[in-house]
């Protein structure tokens, strides 16, 4: 019976399970082989299985070894790279956009990068100073308070000014320049010129009526003279000395009788209510007013009239003389026509004169 059982066990087939899809890994196949060999009888099978497992372990150890060749680094400061920073970020597992773009000069170890970063930061500061608004210092102060840089979180007391404000005040200086605290920073792109003209502080009651209820205790000046501001003096036509002399002088003093025209230059007709400008040109009053409504310059020479048209005395005198001469000639002609002398009387008068 024992011999029959031994022969039956020796003739029993070995069952091996295989996957239908995919290739079986090396570890699985070696395990199945070890199971099959261990199921066989005899000490030779166990020793064979032990040797197979040792060889597979040595093969797996030799296959997992990775050799990395180190690249040679040159000490040239002109050669720059960001490989070390990228490798460090990849190992830490945080590859964000800000970390990829930021390159630390100390980590890279390049001398040229330090100088270029300093130059770029200075240029950026100049651009910010030129483009910032007038309340940039208040904005930075607000951000510092929000971030808690000036707070007493570390236990060190820094005074009442460093207290953290959790409520946003309306009068923070950023919303309106009229309510801002402290001086306003001047813009760098716009240049302004300010002209300040102070009021004379003259007592209005005393100037207009000559009486003030406050008497000597009035804080305003008691003077009835005319006080004008700077812009009012500039508007006046006689503000300059040259213009004042031109106004005080008579424009018709230097004119002779031959220089006086006999007709208006605008309407080309005889004068009707003639006027003269400061530049000694004669026009009709209606023509001069119509011309001034369209253009304030003189029609003859193009100088500024200033709206001053004086009565032309010499033209009026000349017109009166012409009228008197015409009237006298008309009178003489009329008298001569009314009292004609006969021809024989003229002849006898001539004969008597000859004798």
From Swiss-Prot:
This is Pre-mRNA-splicing factor CWC24. Associated with the spliceosome. The gene is CWC24. InterPro entries: CWC24-like (IPR039971), Znf_CCCH (IPR000571), Znf_CCCH_sf (IPR036855), Znf_RING (IPR001841), Znf_RING/FYVE/PHD (IPR013083), Znf_RING_CS (IPR017907). Involved in pre-mRNA splicing. Belongs to the CWC24 family. GO terms for cellular component: U2-type spliceosomal complex. Residues 44-64 have a biased composition (Low complexity). Residues 25-42 have a biased composition (Polar residues). The keyword NAD does not apply. A zinc finger (RING-type) spans 264-302.
